[in-house]
C-alpha cells in the first residue's frame, strides 16, 4: 500500500469518527434545541450549526489526541474524544443559549454526551483493531550512542504493534555499514552527536526511511531558528528568547482575564478547600520561594498538602506520591484533583506567573541542576507558568533533562495558539494518575522541590 492510500484510508476512518460523535448532537439539536431559538432557521442555519460542530470537534480532537489511533490505547482514544466532544458541546450550548436569549435545558445535552460516549467507545475499539489488522508493524531499527531504553519505551507504551524493533546497534556499528538500515521503515536515533547523526539522516532520507531523533538541548534551540538570507546565502538566526512586545502584551492580558474569571468562578471551591486544609489546625496556605524570568525570586502560593513539620530538619525530600506519609488526608484529595495549585491564580494576577510557561523551580534545586547541566538556566528566559509543555507532555517523574528540553521547545516557539493548546490539553491530564506519579527513592526530577 502506498503512503497516499495509507493517508486516505486514515482520513476516511477519522471523518467517520467525527460523524459518529456528531450524530447524538444532531439528534439533540433537531429534536429539541432547534425549537428553542427565537428564529425559525432555514436549512442553511441547521447546516451552519452542524458545520460549526464538525470544525470545532476536529480542532479540539487534535488537541486531545482523539484521532491518534496508532499511538493511543483504546481508553486514551475514548478519553480524548469525550473531552473534545464535551468542549464542543459546551461551545455550541453557549451559542444556542445566545440564539434563544435564555438558559436552555441541559438534560438533552447530557443525553447527547452519553450517546457520544457510546459512539466513542465503539469507534475507538473498532478503529484500533482495524488499524493493526490493516497496517502491520513497521520494521524498525534503534541506533544509539548513549542508550535511552527505546525498546523498553516502545513496549511500555504499547507500541510494539506499530514498531517491530528488528535491529539495535551502536552508532559506530551503524556508520561502519549503513546498509544495515536498508529495508527498515523507521529508525530511532538516540544520544547520537550531530555529525554522526547527519550521516545517518542523509542515508535515511535518501532511502525513504522515517527517522525519529531524540534531540539534545542544542537541537531544540536550533529548532526555533529564524530562516533568512544574507550575503546571498541561506542562514539561520539563533538567539535568546525575545518575544515581541505585542505578543507579551496580549499574553499578559490573557493572564489577567483568565486568572480573574477563574478566581470568581472557583471562589466557592477555594473557600471550601481552605476550610478543609485548616481542619488539622495548620495554615491553609503554603508559601515557597521560586524562580521566574531572569532568575527573579517570588513566593509561590499553594494550598498546604503536607504536615506543617514536613521539612522540620531543613532537608528537602522528594515526594513519593501516595506513599509519602507527610501528605495529609486532605492533601491526598486536593493533590489528586490539582486543587492545591489553585491559589497560584493570585500569583498570575500579580504578575509573578503566567498561565503557560516553564514551572518555577526552587533556587536551591535550580542551583543544583545548573551544576550538573548548565543549560538548565535557559529555562529562565521566559516567565514561569501555572502549566506548561513539560507538564502536559511529560510526567511528574520525567527526568530533569527531558523536562528541560520540553520547556525549551516551548520557549523556542512562542505562540498564543500554542498557549491555548497547552491550556486546553491541561484539562486532559487533570484526571490522569500517571501525570502525578511520585518518584522512587533517589530519583530526582525537575519538580522535586515541590513538596507542598
What positions do the PLM features span?
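N-terminal hydrophobic signal-anchor/signal peptide
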Residues: 1-24, 125-264, 437-452
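Short, glycine-rich, amphipathic interfacial segments at transmembrane boundaries or analogous
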Residues: 218-219, 286-326, 386-405
Amino acid at each position: 500500500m502506498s503512503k497516499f492510500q495509507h493517508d486516505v484510508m486514515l482520513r476516511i476512518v477519522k471523518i467517520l469518527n467525527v460523524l459518529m460523535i456528531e450524530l447524538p448532537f444532531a439528534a439533540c439539536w433537531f429534536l429539541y434545541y432547534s425549537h428553542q431559538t427565537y428564529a425559525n432557521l432555514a436549512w442553511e442555519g441547521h447546516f451552519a450549526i452542524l458545520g460549526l460542530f464538525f470544525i470545532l470537534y476536529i480542532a479540539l480532537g487534535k488537541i486531545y489526541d482523539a484521532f491518534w489511533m496508532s499511538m493511543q490505547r483504546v481508553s486514551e482514544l475514548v478519553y480524548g474524544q469525550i473531552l473534545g466532544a464535551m468542549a464542543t458541546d459546551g461551545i455550541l450550548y453557549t451559542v444556542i443559549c445566545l440564539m434563544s436569549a435564555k438558559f436552555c435545558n441541559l438534560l438533552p445535552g447530557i443525553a447527547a454526551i452519553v450517546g457520544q460516549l457510546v459512539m466513542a467507545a465503539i469507534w475507538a475499539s473498532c478503529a484500533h483493531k482495524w488499524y493493526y489488522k490493516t497496517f502491520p508493524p513497521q520494521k524498525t531499527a534503534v541506533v544509539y550512542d548513549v542508550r535511552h531504553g527505546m525498546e523498553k519505551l516502545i513496549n511500555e507504551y504499547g507500541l510494539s504493534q506499530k514498531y517491530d524493533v528488528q535491529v539495535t546497534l551502536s552508532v559506530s556499528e551503524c556508520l561502519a555499514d549503513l546498509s544495515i538500515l536498508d529495508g527498515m521503515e523507521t529508525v530511532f536515533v538516540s544520544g547520537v552527536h550531530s555529525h554522526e547523526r547527519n550521516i545517518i539522516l542523509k542515508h535515511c532520507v535518501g532511502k525513504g526511511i522515517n527517522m525519529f531523533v531524540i534531540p539534545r538541548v542544542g537541537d531544540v534551540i536550533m529548532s526555533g531558528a529564524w530562516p533568512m538570507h544574507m550575503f546571498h546565502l541561506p542562514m539561520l538566526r539563533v538567539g535568546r528568547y525575545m518575544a515581541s512586545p505585542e505578543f507579551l502584551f496580549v499574553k499578559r492580558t490573557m493572564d489577567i482575564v483568565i486568572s480573574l474569571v477563574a478566581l470568581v468562578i472557583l471562589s466557592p471551591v477555594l473557600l471550601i478547600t481552605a476550610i478543609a486544609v485548616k481542619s488539622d489546625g495548620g495554615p491553609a496556605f503554603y508559601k515557597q520561594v521560586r524562580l521566574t524570568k531572569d532568575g527573579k525570586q517570588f513566593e509561590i502560593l499553594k494550598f498546604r498538602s503536607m504536615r506543617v513539620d514536613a521539612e522540620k530538619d531543613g532537608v528537602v525530600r522528594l515526594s513519593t506520591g501516595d506513599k509519602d506519609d507527610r501528605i495529609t488526608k486532605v492533601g491526598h484529595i486536593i493533590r489528586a484533583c490539582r486543587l492545591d495549585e489553585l491559589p497560584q491564580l493570585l500569583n498570575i494576577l500579580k504578575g509573578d506567573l503566567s498561565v503557560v510557561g516553564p514551572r518555577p523551580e526552587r533556587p536551591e534545586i535550580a542551583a543544583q541542576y545548573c551544576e550538573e547541566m548548565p543549560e538548565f538556566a535557559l529555562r529562565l528566559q521566559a516567565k514561569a507558568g501555572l502549566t506548561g509543555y513539560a507538564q502536559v507532555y511529560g510526567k511528574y517523574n520525567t527526568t530533569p533533562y527531558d523536562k528541560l528540553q520540553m520547556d525549551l521547545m516551548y520557549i523556542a516557539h512562542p505562540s498564543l495558539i500554542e498557549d491555548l493548546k497547552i491550556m486546553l490539553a491541561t484539562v486532559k491530564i487533570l484526571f490522569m494518575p500517571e501525570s502525578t506519579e511520585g518518584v522512587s527513592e533517589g530519583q530526582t526530577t525537575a519538580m522535586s522541590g515541590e513538596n507542598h
